[in-house]
Amino acid sequence: MTPKLKLNTNSNWTKKTLGSLFELKKGEMLEKELLAPDGKYEYFNGGIKASGRTNEFNTFKNTISIIIGGSCGYVRLADKDYFCGQSSCTLTVLDPLEIDLKFAYYALKSQEEKITSLASGTTIKNIRLSDLKDLPIPLVKSIQDQRTIAHALSVFDLRIEHLNELIEVNRKLRDEYAHKLFTLDPDFLTHWNLHELHEQMGEISLGEVFHLKSGKYLKADERFEDGKFPYYGAGIESTSFVNEPNTKGDTLSMIANGYSIGNIRYHTIPWFNGTGGIAMEALKPNKTYVPFFYCALKYMQKDLKERFKRDESPFISLKLAGEIKVPFVKSFALQRKAGKIIYLLDKTLEECKEEAKSLISIRDNLLGKLFPTLS
């Protein structure tokens, strides 16, 4: 039987300062010559993701750390030994009988916004250890209740971790397959029975395959948090919804300016093409397998982004987009056969991303309900 969760209305909750529960230790500087691309250990410093790898380590697994310089306030619980850089600090539980390690991690995660607010500085933000030690942390007195709460939240994290592994595997496989397909790797073509590509693969400009349309400006009051048709602008993700789409499904789009310039999207349902985007509708829908061109453009995406970002005022005009050369196969059947191999991997990748995003939202919502708000 699953134990009943103790919500934040429970009278057994109290609060203690971070310094009374943990021993804090600042990380160490890692010399550049100790960085190794194939090193045994990850090196975490001031970023959420690893800053590199090394063959040295200074922190054991199952250690909590907080970033105090850079992405200030981010709380991490390592599952492997690693090197903790000087822009992070480690937290060691002083009394394991008073606070469970996993519960401690989630208690700190529930206070990330407050931890982040401790950062000071003009250009480079930092958190002083003295300020961190005075931060109040929510604590439920019963160690068993702590473990019950930690278990409920860790179920989500285990699934999210598994999804992240699947995302990485599918991303690598998709990129590997795309490279082999569009470089006409002989072994790959033999394996998938795509020999005809040797004779049929050529190049064509986007303007010869697609009708390109610039995005349309839409007032804020015409966009909604929920709805049927997604709105896409200059960001990778949909930011809102609209009542009426201006572009049909089975279409592509390219981000025309801003930080994400050159990013390619495939839309399976009708959508609204907003400011900062270029929509691409097939000129001959019955003779164009759109996912094939999506996979081709995704394969080219990194080079396209680098090319456009080199410009003084990065912006992709309709003319420039229409002149982009992409791999082309005249046979619709061959487009479909080749494109599906890559597209199905990309689709699985996106499904894993969506599930992970949804679970993170549910977990964070539960985190807020389980832990009380401290004054």
From Swiss-Prot:
Molecular functions (GO terms): DNA binding
Domain text: Contains two DNA recognition domains, each specifying recognition of one of the two defined components of the target sequence.
Keywords: DNA-binding, Restriction system
Disulfide bonds: none
Similarity comment: Belongs to the type-I restriction system S methylase family.
Protein origin, superkingdom: Bacteria
Record's note on what induces expression: Highly expressed after 6 and 96 hours growth, there are fewer copies at 96 hours (at protein level).
Keyword Cell membrane listed: no
Protein's GO biological process: DNA restriction-modification system
Quaternary assembly: The methyltransferase is composed of M and S polypeptides.
Gene3D superfamilies for this protein: Bipartite methylase S protein (1.10.287.1120), DNA methylase specificity domains (3.90.220.20)
Role summary: The specificity (S) subunit of a type I methyltransferase (MTase); this subunit dictates DNA sequence specificity. The single R subunit has multiple frameshifts and is probably not expressed.
CDD domains associated with the record: RMtype1_S_MgeORF438P-TRD-CR_like
Keyword DNA-binding: yes
Protein name: Putative type I specificity subunit S.MpnORF638P
